[in-house]
Structure formats: structure tokens, C-alpha cells
Curated annotation (Swiss-Prot):
CDD domains: LSm4. The gene is LSM4. Keywords: mRNA processing, mRNA splicing, Nucleus, Ribonucleoprotein, RNA-binding, Spliceosome. LSm subunits form a heteromer with a doughnut shape. It comes from Fagus sylvatica. The keyword Ribonucleoprotein applies. This is Probable U6 snRNA-associated Sm-like protein LSm4.
Length: 148
């Protein structure tokens, strides 16, 4: 479970945010963005010492100042159910890039022409010839692109 998916699911729920400075903020999550910046409503801020309290209608917390977040268990359960249902709907291997080496299926690329094995043999033969110092144009067979 990713932290941002957890925060997106926690919108509208109460949460506790502790900052690196030691202050804590209790409130209802309104919104969060990709940098984990958080907007809370009906906030109670507690000082680092725990002896002073402030009530605010809303507050914005920058993501890189957050030490940890405490969300209700029901939100965590809901996220786990969503990720499980998402995994059940999608067959394995779908949506994870182009993949490699599969010839069956709708997204597979069909091999045309001489085929991969023949092309590999040609490439190996070319490397062997170049490696033995055979003359290859202006460069004299010493590698490089032959400039000069």
C-alpha cells in the first residue's frame, strides 16, 4: 500500500499529523497532493511540550515537514480492500510495461523475417571479425567510429 493512496482514501476522515518539530495537528483531511502536502479542517494544534493548544478552522501542512501520520484503522482496511479488488480485476502481467519474450497474446509482437536466432548469429560473427583486427575501413580495425 502506497502512502499517497492511503491519504487519498483518508480524505474526510480524522487524522493526527506529527511534524519533525514535535508539534501535532489533529483534524479532518480535506486534500493532499503528490508531495504529501496536507490540507486539514477543524484543526487542534498541540505544542511540542504538550502544554499549549490552538484551535484553527483549517490549516495547510507542507509534506516535507511531516514526521508521521496516524489514520483510523477503517481507512487502512478500505485501502487494502481496494488494492485487493484492483489486483483481482486485472490479469497478471497486464499494464506493467511492454514485457519481453512472449509470443502469444494480444500485445505480443510477431517475429518477422530471418528470426532472432539467425540475427544473433550474424551479430556474433560480426563481433568476432571486428575483434580479430580485420580491416574495417579508415579506422584500421582498432574500434571506434573511424573518425580522422
Amino acid at each position: 500500500m502506497l502512502p499517497l493512496s492511503l491519504l487519498k482514501t483518508a480524505q474526510g476522515h480524522p487524522m493526527l499529523v506529527e511534524l519533525k518539530s514535535g508539534e501535532t495537528y489533529n483534524g479532518h483531511l480535506v486534500n493532499c497532493d503528490t508531495w504529501m502536502n496536507i490540507h486539514l479542517r477543524e484543526v487542534i494544534c498541540t505544542s511540542k511540550d504538550g502544554d499549549r493548544f490552538w484551535r484553527m478552522p483549517d490549516c495547510y501542512i507542507r509534506g516535507n515537514t511531516i514526521k508521521y501520520l496516524r489514520v483510523p484503522d477503517e481507512v487502512i482496511d478500505k485501502v487494502q480492500e481496494e488494492t485487493k479488488s484492483r489486483a483481482d480485476r486485472k490479469p497478471p502481467g497486464v499494464g506493467r510495461g511492454r514485457g519481453r519474450g512472449r509470443e502469444e497474446g494480444s500485445g505480443a509482437r510477431q517475429v518477422r523475417g530471418a528470426g532472432r536466432d539467425v540475427m544473433m548469429q550474424v551479430a556474433k560473427a560480426w563481433v568476432e571479425v571486428r575483434g580479430r583486427g580485420a580491416s574495417a575501413g579508415k579506422s584500421g580495425g582498432r574500434g571506434g567510429r573511424g573518425r580522422g
